[in-house]
Amino acid sequence: LAATALLAAVKRRGGEVRDGVTALKLRSGGVETCEGFLHCDAVVNACGPWAGAFSEAAGAPIAVLPRRGMLLVTAPLPYAVRHKVYDADYVGAVASGDADLQTSTVVESTRAGTVLIGSSRQRVGFDDTIRVAVLRAMAQKAIRLFPMLAQVPVMRAYGGFRPYAPDHLPVIGEDPRVPGLWHATGHEGAGIGLAAATGQLLADLYLGRPPVVDPYPFRVDRPAVLKREGDGS
């Protein structure tokens, strides 16, 4: 719903949405897409977990990688989980830079009565295979917090990729290496919640207005993010 609302706001302000169009590379005065050249003064790399790949194609690589996560959704049940609950391991997993699998408990109910059970983190490129062993580990940890979940059937499971930056901060701002290229990525699991504020900050910077927050921690040319020629990180 949040993404739908943001998209509607873009359209109300004159924005155009082109479904199924892939940006291939930057050229002077715009961007080359699978449907031809698109003229523009600025290109925003908001490609999420694919932001690192696009930055390579744009000639300004940044260290943003996909970090896979999975989630379980239970069948609807009477209102039992009244607040979002997570264990202490969750904070450590979010802040970790380890590429290996990490699971930590997050349990949250929805208005429809289903319960969301997470979470996992693992850097495996874009391998989107759903791993039963990972789902089982998440379920077992959730049952320790809420034993009644042991009797609740799982309705579905799904996974996705978070855009991971090595220092765990978003990448927001103009790229100093390529004029007209801007980045808005690296939020990992907080992207949808920070989307509106990120757009506001990016607009402030582009238009030369006083920024809504200090942009310095999110700058593109910080050591953890900027990849230079010959850098294999």
Sequence positions of predicted segments:
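Short acidic/polar mixed-charge low-complexity motifs
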Residues: 34-37, 113, 190
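Helical element adjacent to the flavin cofactor pocket in flavoenzyme catalytic cores
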Residues: 1-41
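Active-site substrate-recognition segment that forms the wall
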Residues: 47-176
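General beta-strand structural signal in soluble alpha/beta enzymes
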Residues: 17-19, 45, 64, 183
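General beta-strand recognition
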Residues: 30-32, 115-116, 171, 182-183
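C-terminal catalytic lobe of FAD-dependent flavoproteins
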Residues: 127-233
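Short hydrophobic core segments
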Residues: 38-50, 54, 199
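Helix-loop-beta segment of a Rossmann-like dinucleotide-binding subdomain
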Residues: 1-13, 120-124, 179, 185-187
